[in-house]
């Protein structure tokens, strides 16, 4: 079997809307930031007001799915920290599983390991 490039697009489905996320180094960085958001939520969640915490989650969601995605996802809904946490966690878990499947493929060059990018 020869070398081949794999599909680097993960499709995230939220409320029947599909968001295409391209696997690249910047995505890994944004996922690490999302993980930090989870940690800060656990540490400071009860100290912040709901709007501030929701805004943090919205920025994290937008950084991964694209600007305005969080507003579209939560349009017409009351601010709810747990809903935002659940959506961001779902996105994080889906992308982590996607990256794991890419890394397990044989004869595939993941972009994060390509020294020419």
Regions found by a protein language model. Give the residues of each.
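Compositionally biased, non-globular sequence tracts
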Residues: 47-58
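Compositionally biased, low-structure terminal segments
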Residues: 4-6, 24, 39-42, 58, ...
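Short N-terminal mixed-charge amphipathic segments
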Residues: 1-48
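Glycine-centered helix-coil hinge/cap
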Residues: 66-67
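C-terminal charged interaction modules
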Residues: 70-117
């Amino acid at each position: 079997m020869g070398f081949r490039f794999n599909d680097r697009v993960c499709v995230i489905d939220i409320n029947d809307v599909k968001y295409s996320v391209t696997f690249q180094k910047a995505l890994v960085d944004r996922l690490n930031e999302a993980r930090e958001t989870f940690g800060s939520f656990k540490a400071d969640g009860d100290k912040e007001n709901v709007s501030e915490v929701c805004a943090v989650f919205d920025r994290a969601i937008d950084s991964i799915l694209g600007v305005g995605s969080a507003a579209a996802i939560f349009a017409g809904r009351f601010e709810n920290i747990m809903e935002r946490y659940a959506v961001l966690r779902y996105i994080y878990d889906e992308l982590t599983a996607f990256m794991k499947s890419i890394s397990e493929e044989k004869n595939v060059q993941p972009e994060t390991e390509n020294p020419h990018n």
